[in-house]
């Protein structure tokens, strides 16, 4: 089995999701949760809380690979910068443990999980629940993190079958 950690970075909440992928390519739910960062009085405190929270998840679940959502351009420059900083902290927590990081754009994730690059949050939550046989409504950030992990599982399986890298497996060339 391959264990994958999916991360949906955020400066207020960061979603984390862990799945196992068996030898047949089936994904199995292990863990998901939002890391809520709003309890800190400063932004630096939130980043520290994010680093410690992700480190604890990595320590407890021992993923072999990590997939993270890429930053999208926002109309609010301050929000985009904070998101980029949170994403940098998340990647740092991963690379400090010598784990491979795979990055996917939001449209790629939506296409892989829902079949439509313009899917909305509810569609992602629903499909992640169906794919992982989960009951009840998933919290949005955690569902997004599981979706990133599922996307990587699918792209990785395709890359392995084709004998190419995950970047090449996603490419249309």
Swiss-Prot record:
**Active site (UniProt):** 8, 69, 141
Q: Which residues bind Mg(2+) 2?
A: 69
**What's its EC?**
3.1.21.10
Any single GO BP term: DNA repair
Q: Which SUPFAM superfamilies match?
A: Ribonuclease H-like
Required co-factors: Mg(2+)
Q: Which GO terms describe its cellular component?
A: cytoplasm; Holliday junction resolvase complex
Q: What class of enzyme is it?
A: hydrolase
Q: Name one Pfam family in it.
A: RuvC
| Family matches, as CDD domains | RuvC
What PANTHER family does this protein's entry cite?
A: CROSSOVER JUNCTION ENDODEOXYRIBONUCLEASE RUVC (PTHR30194:SF3)
Q: What does this protein do?
A: The RuvA-RuvB-RuvC complex processes Holliday junction (HJ) DNA during genetic recombination and DNA repair. Endonuclease that resolves HJ intermediates. Cleaves cruciform DNA by making single-stranded nicks across the HJ at symmetrical positions within the homologous arms, yielding a 5'-phosphate and a 3'-hydroxyl group; requires a central core of homology in the junction. The consensus cleavage sequence is 5'-(A/T)TT(C/G)-3'. Cleavage occurs on the 3'-side of the TT dinucleotide at the point of strand exchange.
Q: What is this protein called?
A: Crossover junction endodeoxyribonuclease RuvC
Tell me what organism the protein belongs to.
Answer: Xylella fastidiosa (strain Temecula1 / ATCC 700964)
The gene that this protein is the product of is ruvC
